[in-house]
Amino acid sequence: MARQPPPPWVHAAFLLCLLSLGGAIEIPMDPSIQNELTQPPTITKQSAKDHIVDPRDNILIECEAKGNPAPSFHWTRNSRFFNIAKDPRVSMRRRSGTLVIDFRSGGRPEEYEGEYQCFARNKFGTALSNRIRLQVSKSPLWPKENLDPVVVQEGAPLTLQCNPPPGLPSPVIFWMSSSMEPITQDKRVSQGHNGDLYFSNVMLQDMQTDYSCNARFHFTHTIQQKNPFTLKVLTTRGVAERTPSFMYPQGTASSQMVLRGMDLLLECIASGVPTPDIAWYKKGGDLPSDKAKFENFNKALRITNVSEEDSGEYFCLASNKMGSIRHTISVRVKAAPYWLDEPKNLILAPGEDGRLVCRANGNPKPTVQWMVNGEPLQSAPPNPNREVAGDTIIFRDTQISSRAVYQCNTSNEHGYLLANAFVSVLDVPPRMLSPRNQLIRVILYNRTRLDCPFFGSPIPTLRWFKNGQGSNLDGGNYHVYENGSLEIKMIRKEDQGIYTCVATNILGKAENQVRLEVKDPTRIYRMPEDQVARRGTTVQLECRVKHDPSLKLTVSWLKDDEPLYIGNRMKKEDDSLTIFGVAERDQGSYTCVASTELDQDLAKAYLTVLADQATPTNRLAALPKGRPDRPRDLELTDLAERSVRLTWIPGDANNSPITDYVVQFEEDQFQPGVWHDHSKYPGSVNSAVLRLSPYVNYQFRVIAINEVGSSHPSLPSERYRTSGAPPESNPGDVKGEGTRKNNMEITWTPMNATSAFGPNLRYIVKWRRRETREAWNNVTVWGSRYVVGQTPVYVPYEIRVQAENDFGKGPEPESVIGYSGEDYPRAAPTEVKVRVMNSTAISLQWNRVYSDTVQGQLREYRAYYWRESSLLKNLWVSQKRQQASFPGDRLRGVVSRLFPYSNYKLEMVVVNGRGDGPRSETKEFTTPEGVPSAPRRFRVRQPNLETINLEWDHPEHPNGIMIGYTLKYVAFNGTKVGKQIVENFSPNQTKFTVQRTDPVSRYRFTLSARTQVGSGEAVTEESPAPPNEATPTAAPPTLPPTTVGATGAVSSTDATAIAATTEATTVPIIPTVAPTTIATTTTVATTTTTTAAATTTTESPPTTTSGTKIHESAPDEQSIWNVTVLPNSKWANITWKHNFGPGTDFVVEYIDSNHTKKTVPVKAQAQPIQLTDLYPGMTYTLRVYSRDNEGISSTVITFMTSTAYTNNQADIATQGWFIGLMCAIALLVLILLIVCFIKRSRGGKYPVREKKDVPLGPEDPKEEDGSFDYSDEDNKPLQGSQTSLDGTIKQQESDDSLVDYGEGGEGQFNEDGSFIGQYTVKKDKEETEGNESSEATSPVNAIYSLA
């Protein structure tokens, strides 16, 4: 027959029946034992110490107690016996000490005010309640008063005083207008904690309403209103601005006292124009961020749950643009008594020893007073078995007569604590608390525990026997726990039998028997296998099981981890599952579960269903797919203590099958409104059993997922709250670290809603010093930190943090090692030795400090060093201190990156978590001469085709005595490289002119500075490309990448670019010609870092590019790359790439040649941007960085705005083709002048037409009667110039202007009458009119006119 589970009371008895620390006995919760055993009284319920009642209701003063026999009750009022029988209005409830004062028949509640105390008594002692102070709530009326209008100057401060009537409890104050509208408050107008209304400065709009102070009384639910204030504001032409001044509190300093555990409220209200801002600070530390909050527009600082470490000086700073003032508030934290060790009930057996401990703390230190049965201990009869030692009472060899109730009253000026603890002496023979002759069945090879709860006084000893014989079972495969349970670590067949537990004390013994049966395990020996089947076929899944024949076997099947519904198409047998006519919905995982009442085994297989080959293509596949619709109609069923079934109706899949469902939950205690993932289920289910945590008010929703995406969440389900339980885990990440030298802050990660398991989650914090193994200190904390004060410096502690709620405590936590606070080290490294290794590095060696002087964890040795001066005269150096760290307990190290040729000083310290220790003796050393840095601003200019001008500046860091410069240069043309030439210059020379030997080639220059040690870092530049280097082509400008080296060299951007790295890598020429209207672009490959570019980049020589682009690969981390600049003469377009999120803002920073820096903020998605108001021909450096993090920046690039012609072109006046053209024109003009001069001096004959009607042709030969004196060759240039310049005028296209004239001696006219007229006698005016029409058509005249 199967063993029935024991009733719940057995588990309770099992947990509570045994002894606790110090040999004390806990009485089990078994009602029969509770009713049988005698017990002194214990107060179980009482009213609050300050008990305020509503005068309209009856007065109720609670007092309830338990004990055996049941206690009787009586009261004192104002320390005198209160005779209830004499007052008809006062009665006491039956079986209770609660007082009821009834005023239905009249009477005034005020007559019963006073201090009450309840006494609960039986024959074994008397328990006391707290002293309950009864007060009747009061809501007095406002005194009548006439308020004159308040006249105030505009901009002046103003305080409207409320002065509410004193109420009990104090009323809530608020201000209203005459129209019953709340007064709008802001940082200018606000209500103080005292109820007054403060105006930092009055404005005209303030007199548009009246101001009335209102007091709301809590108990009577009444509101009293003060007569309203009327404001009259006097206006002025201009409100003068004023520095702030404090309206409350007055002066520059004040003090405030607060009790531990209460809220501290500090307030500062200031006046001024404009309205001041208020800021709060704490002297010597930060405000406690976890419990400090600002109120009333930063005018009030509230610190909740004040502790001793919150004492100190706080100050508020009021400031506006006219100035600032501050007020210091000295805060003192006092404390009413609070428990360190509250006395607990003590149950002993006759002759046993025990103790009551009453330990409390407070400020000032509280006093402890012991009482017994309500009387001072000094007045009680002497007891030789009792000894009082301050806060402890020690009992030795207790007897039955020692039973009593002890009271511990600890008090100081701020309050008191009263605790009752009884001492009960019991002599009870052993008793068994579990049913007799239980049957326990277990599975072979498992672990099991046999329980035998018992009770007795004195505490019995328990032993186990098997089959009524043999020795006590303990050791080997058996283990007996302190509570008496017997554990069998691995069950074997031979362990089957009858086990007897025997409990014994001096009063007798009791025994019980447990019968143990061992069963074979359930095993699946033939498991179902994964299968692939076509739709419409039959599938069989096997599941063959072996089990104990005495146990009933049940075989069930799950599909996708949910119970499988066996329909008409399925057949379930003992060893298989058959599916007929397989369909797509049958696809999924199948689980065979073989179970008995003791154990189970399971096996899984996956069924894949393929579509039939003859099945036509799904016509839905062509339809557009979308995210599924939200699930709907969520329903909770099968409500259990730790689980619930959630069912939903799927939404439309929108042509894409639903693959998964995600169930989310929300709880309304810890994170209301925040949804968390609970579990995930296949898309084929629409119901799931959800495992729940205790004491969570759940609400669920479901999200469907397909290949397109997730649906909108479903509407939430109804809420379901689970019952509570003790926590099953403890908080994690427990740490102990000091924040000051004399404390240790214990912190942990608080538990969330699903691990709290009950209301009022709190944490029991325990600690003790690791070395001393002293008793544990403990405190209960509601937050996630606790500060242990008055600790030695850097001492290890054992720390435990245990979760607890109203249902009980969590499991016993493991200890964590923490350390108290560190103090500054007390010693410095000694015997510091410095050895100069080279011009930039030294080695250090020192002796370690003693460990006891570190006063903390030794983090590192640190060297502070600074450059005192340079050995070069008149060279200013920065004396900024630098540091080098040497982590761990080391004795030597190296300091590098020093400046050569300099005097240095060095000190060493030891560093712990607190900071630096004292400095060692200062050591001085000198670094030898080194090589200089690169020359600055190396510039290459080409004024003409014959020379190249070089200019540079001295190195920024000479690093020694400069002896000169070395210039190396070489000519190159494509892949051809000439011979390298080396020039040496004096240290004062900063210019050099190179005479070009080849006007076609370009030059590469490398310049470095020298000291006695050698040459320093070199800088490389190239001459611009000549303009005739390119071949005609319409291709856009293309440039190979150039790597920017440490010198900051940037490649040229001429029409034909030759890319050369700073390592002198030769790249083939790519000839291109760029149209003059298209800006060329230089591409520079570099690596983006998250720091600003090196200064050498910003000091790079200005390039002659029209546009600059930084081409880089996109890194994994957040970066900015591929910055592109397309400049014109007065503006430039900027673009870049980045991998920041959307909405990121950037800043473009650029600096011109005059070192003027400007920034342009760029809103998100605003690329490209345009920089305007630039100067033509000026060099700029530019970078782009993130507005949120300036450290994430692009590489610094350099560009130049364009001029009338680009700088890389030679001067046109020096070009050979231009000079040749000008010489040809000058020669032609000279020839024409000579011809004209000869003609003018000699004259000539011109051919005239032979017949009037025939015009003179340009190729006519000279006639016999009219010919030139020049030869035919002389006339050819004139004839040849008769044709128009464009070659389009034909012979017959010009009219002869002289065709109407006859022949005569004056006929010396050619077609240009104006020419002849200059050298012959003119005709009459009538004869010459009309001849001028041929003047413009004669090219000969044009040439002659040049003469």
Swiss-Prot record:
<feature type="compositionally biased region" description="Pro residues">
    <location>
        <begin position="1024"/>
        <end position="1040"/>
    </location>
</feature>
<feature type="disulfide bond">
    <location>
        <begin position="268"/>
        <end position="316"/>
    </location>
</feature>
<feature type="domain" description="Fibronectin type-III 5">
    <location>
        <begin position="1114"/>
        <end position="1206"/>
    </location>
</feature>
<feature type="domain" description="Ig-like C2-type 6">
    <location>
        <begin position="521"/>
        <end position="603"/>
    </location>
</feature>
<feature type="modified residue" description="Phosphoserine">
    <location>
        <position position="1333"/>
    </location>
</feature>
<feature type="modified residue" description="Phosphoserine">
    <location>
        <position position="1338"/>
    </location>
</feature>
<feature type="glycosylation site" description="N-linked (GlcNAc...) asparagine">
    <location>
        <position position="752"/>
    </location>
</feature>
<feature type="glycosylation site" description="N-linked (GlcNAc...) asparagine">
    <location>
        <position position="483"/>
    </location>
</feature>
<dbReference type="GO" id="GO:0033268">
    <property type="term" value="C:node of Ranvier"/>
</dbReference>
<dbReference type="Pfam" id="PF13882">
    <property type="entry name" value="Bravo_FIGEY"/>
</dbReference>
<keyword id="KW-0472">Membrane</keyword>
<feature type="domain" description="Fibronectin type-III 3">
    <location>
        <begin position="828"/>
        <end position="930"/>
    </location>
</feature>
<feature type="compositionally biased region" description="Acidic residues">
    <location>
        <begin position="1261"/>
        <end position="1272"/>
    </location>
</feature>
<dbReference type="Pfam" id="PF07679">
    <property type="entry name" value="I-set"/>
</dbReference>
<feature type="topological domain" description="Cytoplasmic">
    <location>
        <begin position="1239"/>
        <end position="1347"/>
    </location>
</feature>
<feature type="modified residue" description="Phosphoserine">
    <location>
        <position position="1334"/>
    </location>
</feature>
<feature type="modified residue" description="Phosphoserine">
    <location>
        <position position="1294"/>
    </location>
</feature>
<keyword id="KW-1015">Disulfide bond</keyword>
<feature type="region of interest" description="Disordered">
    <location>
        <begin position="915"/>
        <end position="934"/>
    </location>
</feature>
<dbReference type="GO" id="GO:0042552">
    <property type="term" value="P:myelination"/>
</dbReference>
<feature type="modified residue" description="Phosphoserine">
    <location>
        <position position="1281"/>
    </location>
</feature>
<feature type="domain" description="Ig-like C2-type 4">
    <location>
        <begin position="337"/>
        <end position="424"/>
    </location>
</feature>
<keyword id="KW-1133">Transmembrane helix</keyword>
<feature type="glycosylation site" description="N-linked (GlcNAc...) asparagine">
    <location>
        <position position="973"/>
    </location>
</feature>
<feature type="region of interest" description="Disordered">
    <location>
        <begin position="713"/>
        <end position="740"/>
    </location>
</feature>
<dbReference type="InterPro" id="IPR013151">
    <property type="entry name" value="Immunoglobulin_dom"/>
</dbReference>
<keyword id="KW-1003">Cell membrane</keyword>
<dbReference type="GO" id="GO:0007411">
    <property type="term" value="P:axon guidance"/>
</dbReference>
<feature type="topological domain" description="Extracellular">
    <location>
        <begin position="25"/>
        <end position="1217"/>
    </location>
</feature>
<dbReference type="InterPro" id="IPR003598">
    <property type="entry name" value="Ig_sub2"/>
</dbReference>
<feature type="disulfide bond">
    <location>
        <begin position="543"/>
        <end position="592"/>
    </location>
</feature>
<dbReference type="GO" id="GO:0030424">
    <property type="term" value="C:axon"/>
</dbReference>
<feature type="region of interest" description="Disordered">
    <location>
        <begin position="1011"/>
        <end position="1040"/>
    </location>
</feature>
<feature type="disulfide bond">
    <location>
        <begin position="358"/>
        <end position="408"/>
    </location>
</feature>
<feature type="modified residue" description="Phosphoserine">
    <location>
        <position position="1297"/>
    </location>
</feature>
<dbReference type="InterPro" id="IPR013783">
    <property type="entry name" value="Ig-like_fold"/>
</dbReference>
<dbReference type="GO" id="GO:0098609">
    <property type="term" value="P:cell-cell adhesion"/>
</dbReference>
<feature type="disulfide bond">
    <location>
        <begin position="63"/>
        <end position="118"/>
    </location>
</feature>
<feature type="signal peptide">
    <location>
        <begin position="1"/>
        <end position="24"/>
    </location>
</feature>
<dbReference type="Pfam" id="PF00041">
    <property type="entry name" value="fn3"/>
</dbReference>
<protein>
    <recommendedName>
        <fullName>Neurofascin</fullName>
    </recommendedName>
</protein>
<dbReference type="GO" id="GO:0101003">
    <property type="term" value="C:ficolin-1-rich granule membrane"/>
</dbReference>
